[in-house]
Design a protein with these regions (language model features):
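RNA-binding basic/glycine-rich loop and surface signature characteristic of RAMP-family CRISPR effectors
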Residues: 1-118, 122, 134-195
């Protein structure tokens, strides 16, 4: 089993959430872990990295023929279900703040330290003819500030395949979460291999 630490260097505001609203304040809140801190689920990371590898495979790169074997696949016939799917050989943990920062934030006497990790941003639609905001078009989003998040990646594969997966993630995963077309979620992915 090969292991590495995936470092997500969030370059700007980002939002990973389920679309749940926050009452009158915002329409979409970000997801938080059990400590109330922003995070990126491992399932999302797996999907982003699989997509990066699939793009290289579909472009004709023979080094990426492993995608179904490593990430898992469903039966190609029409009656797809969990019993006919093939399990993958790769695992991603949730991407979270560093243990040191998590410890500091848990010691904080006031909630403002955690609150400083998020912001609310707003947008509205503008009427082209009048140049004013359309009625009922104001939307609010909770976003997380730029930060580094850490996830574990483990794979039951050879080193060449593992290196190809890391290369695809580092080169092709450019954004994480929602509202990417509006500039949110820009990320740089790096890896810290174990000695």
């Amino acid at each position: 089993m090969l292991r590495t630490t995936m470092v997500l260097k969030m370059q700007g505001y980002w939002a990973v959430g389920s679309g749940k609203g926050g009452g009158n304040e915002v329409d979409n809140r970000i997801d938080r872990d059990s400590d109330g801190l922003p995070y990126v689920p491992g399932k999302m990371l797996k999907g982003l990295v699989k997509d990066a590898c699939l793009r290289l495979k579909n472009a004709g790169n023979k080094n990426y023929c492993f995608v179904d074997e490593i990430f898992g696949a469903v039966d190609s016939n029409e009656n797809m279900n969990r019993t006919t799917s093939k399990a993958g050989k790769i695992y991603f943990s949730d991407a979270r703040l560093s243990p040191q920062l998590r410890l500091e934030l848990s010691k904080s006497e006031n909630r403002s330290a955690k609150d400083n990790l998020t912001r609310n941003i707003y947008s509205t639609a503008i009427d082209d003819e009048t140049g004013t905001a359309d009625d009922r078009s104001l939307r609010g989003y909770e976003v997380a500030v730029p930060m580094d998040l850490y996830a574990r990646m483990e794979c039951d594969c050879d080193k060449t395949t593992f290196d190809c997966i890391k290369k695809a993630a580092g080169k092709l995963v450019r954004a994480v979460g929602s509202h990417k077309s509006r500039g949110l979620g820009e990320v740089v992915i790096e890896f810290k291999d174990e000695a």
